[in-house]
Amino acid sequence: TGALRQGQVAAQQALEAEVYQALVLGVRDYLGKNGFPGALLGLSGGIDSALVLAIAVDALGADKVRAVMMPSPYTAEISLADARDMARRLGVRYEEIPIAPGMAAFETMLAPAFSGLPADTTEENIQARIRGSLLMALSNKTGALVLTTGNKSEIAVGYCTLYGDMAGGLAVLKDVKKTLVYRLARWRNSVSSVIPERIITRPPSAELKPGQTDQDSLPPYETLDAIVEAYVEYGRSAPEIIAQGFAEADVRRVLSLLRINEY
């Protein structure tokens, strides 16, 4: 059994290496064949943008990649520290553009129209759209392609913002589930430690409101990914997925989100 486990580990690592190298090749080919001089992305201090940054540098070289941290009042200091640390490790051009002035401007412009209405995800989405606009402005000015950083799990259930973090020219992780994102990050760090360990281990958060984590809105990613895979890739029905041992409430919620967002 020891040899079997060893073989399983080797096969797993081979899969992760193959997927990572395919993502690197995809980025390099796409930019090269379309004539883009380089790439830029929003670096949040989270694992998705960290992995995309590593892939971009491996594909293009650090001199052709620009990372932009766009902190809001809800951005944790450790997110800033981790983004700076990762940019330093990879040697990319890095800058910080706070979005608080943009948030204040939108609040002022929309105050008459929003009068009497409670705050909700609208205000969260405005933050994402400010960031998307900043990245697209930099893209227009420099010719660099914006790489979006959302993963398959988030995109499938709509845990992202149209015209916000979805804005860009290439979605590098569009077919990579969140659980695989973690495995790919671990694999890349086994080659050389470019992703700060805290980025991998801390709970994921969009940081669009105080104390927010992804699991406030979604089931644990291990559960989410398994349900998405069963439904989307294997065509299982809700009763069949529930019969596999998943909580009915989780299955119904995930399938509802999938249906709402599949347009």
Short names for language-model regions:
Residues G2-S44, S49-Y263:
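ATP/NTP-dependent adenylation/nucleotidyl-transfer catalytic domains that generate, transfer
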